[in-house]
Regions:
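Second-shell residues forming the walls of enzyme active-site clefts
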Residues: 9, 36-54, 59, 69-71, ...
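Short, flexible, mixed-charge acidic loops at enzyme active sites
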Residues: 71-80, 125-127, 168
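Preference for extracellular/luminal or secreted protein segments
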Residues: 1-29, 257-355
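Flexible, glycine/proline-enriched loop segments at strand-loop-helix junctions
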Residues: 87-93, 132-141, 180-189
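Short, conserved phosphate-binding/catalytic loop or strand-edge motifs used
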Residues: 119-130
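A generic, well-ordered mixed alpha/beta core segment in the N-terminal half of proteins
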Residues: 75-110
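Catalytic domains of carbohydrate-active enzymes, especially glycoside hydrolases
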Residues: 21-34, 101, 108-113
């Protein structure tokens, strides 16, 4: 079995005996937590500690903590401002402070990887494509300035970062949680605009997440997340992201789950050049997925295993838990949020904010 090429979700706020046994057996690369796992600060820290205790190697402990409506700690702490609200203020120092406080918050809770910043250009700001409020803007330089400042200070707080959603989920006109978006953008279109933030920030990024978007002009058969042309040919070989950890977005989204059966998505992800396949919700399929990955040749997984080992060496352990420190960070977050109010808007009906 190749469980170490999986990143898995957890079902609730504490591990069940069955989950603990499964995770101990599979030894996945790590875990992602959502709002369903977070009911209190001390409880969340215990959960991340328990997951660490199950792992032979330091596990990836990840979360989507972007700010705004994608704030997994919204039930236990004030929400940090969204990327859109921060960039609208035009002050990169505010973006830097948001990154710093995100890092402080996550390390106290036991996380070592944040699936942020979003580097998608906001091509369709009013569209139901799951990204409303989550992008730093339409202009690549604005994204570089603000996402770069945010990312730099997150990493200075010893939390690793993951840019998303490569190559350009901002081109999507629909929500991959519901269906597979299709974009007519060519490789030239992407290089002209969407890829600029990735290449500009390359030395400061730890990981890259692939989008569930189909680009027929580049690969008519596979979405970006499962496309060898995009993952290996474009991201790694052409752009030079050959040292970064690369992983799929959640393979349980309908964009993928409705089209791939019997864990063929997991195999396709690794064969495409991803290092990790992410299963966030249907963890009951994790053991079967690991068995399918075990059928891959060592040649097919060698690069992923090397990059994962290198990535693990960059992970930092959690800060010593302190209720006093937690309350102090929450107070600073509330003060920043008061400086950067969110625009009142009708947000799209996407599950992204509810997990």
């Amino acid at each position: 079995m190749n469980g170490h090429l999986l990143l898995l979700g957890v079902q609730g706020p504490e591990l069940t005996a069955e989950e603990a046994a499964l995770f101990r057996k599979l030894q996945p690369a790590g875990y992602i937590l959502f709002g369903r796992n977070i009911t209190g600060a001390a409880q969340t820290r215990k959960l991340t500690d328990d997951l660490r205790d199950l792992s032979v190697d330091e596990p990836i402990l990840a979360i989507d903590q972007e700010g705004g409506r994608v704030t997994r700690t919204k039930d236990i702490a004030p929400a940090l401002p969204s990327a859109n609200a921060l960039a609208a203020k035009g002050d990169t120092l505010l973006s830097a402070r948001a990154g710093m406080l995100t890092g402080d918050q996550l390390r106290l809770l036991g996380f070592n990887l944040d699936f942020a910043p979003v580097l998608d250009l906001d091509h369709h700001p009013g569209t139901q494509n799951a990204l409303r409020g989550r992008c730093w803007g339409r202009d690549p330089q604005r994204v570089i300035d603000h996402a770069g400042s945010w990312n730099r200070w997150l990493r200075k707080r010893s939390v690793r970062s993951c840019a998303k959603h490569f190559p350009a989920c901002g081109r999507a006109l629909s929500d991959p949680h519901f269906d597979l978006p299709v974009s007519d953008a060519t490789l030239g279109d992407l290089l002209k605009e969407d890829i600029i933030p990735y290449t500009a920030l390359m030395p400061e990024l730890d990981a890259v997440m692939l989008a569930h978007v189909l680009f027929p002009a580049i690969d008519p058969d596979r979405p970006a997340s499962l496309s060898k042309r995009i993952v290996t040919g474009f991201l790694r070989d052409q752009l030079g992201f050959d040292k970064h950890l690369v992983l799929t977005d959640d393979l349980d989204m309908c964009a993928i789950a409705d089209r791939y059966r019997d864990n063929s998505d997991v195999v396709a992800a690794i064969e495409a050049g991803n290092d990790l396949a992410m299963i966030c919700h249907r963890t009951e399929r994790a053991e079967a997925a690991a068995k399918e990955l075990g059928k891959l040749s060592s040649y097919a997984t060698e690069g992923a295993e090397k990059r994962l080992a290198r990535f693990r060496k960059k992970l930092h352990g959690p800060l010593k838990w302190s209720e006093t420190k937690w309350e102090a960070v929450c107070k600073e977050i509330a003060e920043l949020a008061a400086q950067v109010p969110e625009e009142a808007a009708v947000l799209p009906n996407s599950p992204v904010a509810d997990y």
